[in-house]
Swiss-Prot record:
Name under which the protein is recorded: Uricase
GO biological process, one term: deoxyguanosine catabolic process
Modified residues (N6-succinyllysine): 10, 23, 220, 227
Positions carrying Phosphotyrosine: 288
Binding site for urate: 68-69, 170, 187, 234-235, 261
Enzyme Commission designation: 1.7.3.3
Residues the record lists as N-acetylalanine modifications: 2
Annotated motif Microbody targeting signal, positions: 301-303
Length: 303
């Protein structure tokens, strides 16, 4: 028999802002076999639930708690029963399950990220069941759904590391008594892209949109293959990515981007009698600059 502890009970001087619990990093490899042709999705899923009652917090009454081990098992079973066509749909399936199965669940939040496996391919021929890990950007999504509400769907790219050796500069910035940074017309530009966007609706080709955003990120960072494109600041490149994404992809409502400025500094070799003309550089992990920005579509004018 459960014993509830009422030593504290409800405190009139504090109130709950938000509560939640769940299971993080539930890993699954789903294999779809169509004869000898196999397709895979490997994902890590994190689930957070909010319950109507707060009696578990107030009194130690666990009677409404769905064990986190059950949450883990549910993720496994839904992968078996529903498959993983794409991670956004899988996340919506998980939200739908908990909200429809348990009346006392008021909110479900699901985060899923996909391991970047790519099918072996040579001379245009794709292997039927072999894959290679290609860390050229991780596909992730977040879906949050309130009871009696629609799912709010975000997708994103993270861990997309890019570098260009020219066509970047930083000039005309504010200077005060603490400024030692020199202006530069030509420098290396390296960053690790974090990009997250919200969809206006759910009847979209999520994987096609993700691929299109990734292509836009690479296009605006690098520019034309034969000559590149000049970047006067990380901020300008970030904004250009957002504007092109929202102009070309009407399914996207808003977009958040974070671009750390990963530094590569010229190594002074003058004491060794050598002139190093930006040929040998020192990568510095930290400290680093960090540039962020979020844009959304403007509401149409009522005039």
């Amino acid at each position: 028999m459960a014993h509830y502890h009422d030593n504290y009970g409800k405190n009139d001087e504090v109130e709950f802002v938000r509560t939640g619990y769940g299971k993080d990093m539930v890993k699954v490899l789903h294999i779809q076999r169509d004869g000898k042709y196999h397709s895979i999705k490997e994902v890590a899923t994190s689930v957070q639930l909010t319950l109507r009652s707060k009696k578990d917090y107030l009194h130690g009454d666990n009677s409404d708690i769905i064990p986190t081990d059950t949450i883990k098992n549910t993720v496994h079973v839904l992968a078996k029963l529903r498959g993983i066509r794409n991670i956004e749909t899988f996340a919506m399936n998980i939200c739908e399950h908990f909200l429809s199965s348990f009346n006392h669940v008021t909110r479900a939040h699901v985060y899923v990220e996909e391991v970047p496996w790519k099918r072996f391919e040579k001379n245009g021929i794709k292997h039927v069941h072999a894959f290679i890990h290609t860390p050229t950007g991780t596909h992730f999504c977040e879906v949050e759904q309130m009871r009696n509400g629609p799912p709010v769907i975000h997708s994103g790219i993270k861990d997309l590391k890019v570098l260009k050796t020219t066509q970047s500069g930083f000039e005309g910035f504010l200077k005060d008594q603490f400024t030692t940074l020199p202006e530069v017309k030509d420098r290396c530009f390296a960053t690790q892209v974090y990009c997250k966007w919200r969809y206006q609706r759910r009847d979209v080709d999520f994987e096609a949109i993700w691929g299109a955003v990734r292509d836009i990120v690479l296009q605006k960072f690098a520019g034309p293959y034969d000559k590149g494109e000049y970047s006067p600041s990380v901020q300008k490149t970030l904004y250009d990515i957002q504007v092109l994404s929202l102009s070309q992809l009407p399914e996207i409502e808003d977009m958040e981007i974070s671009l750390p400025n990963i530094h590569y500094f010229n190594i002074d070799m003058s004491k060794m009698g050598l002139i190093n003309k930006e040929e040998v550089l020192l990568p510095l992990d930290n400290p680093y600059g960090k540039i962020t920005g979020t844009v959304k579509r403007k509401l149409p004018s009522r005039l």
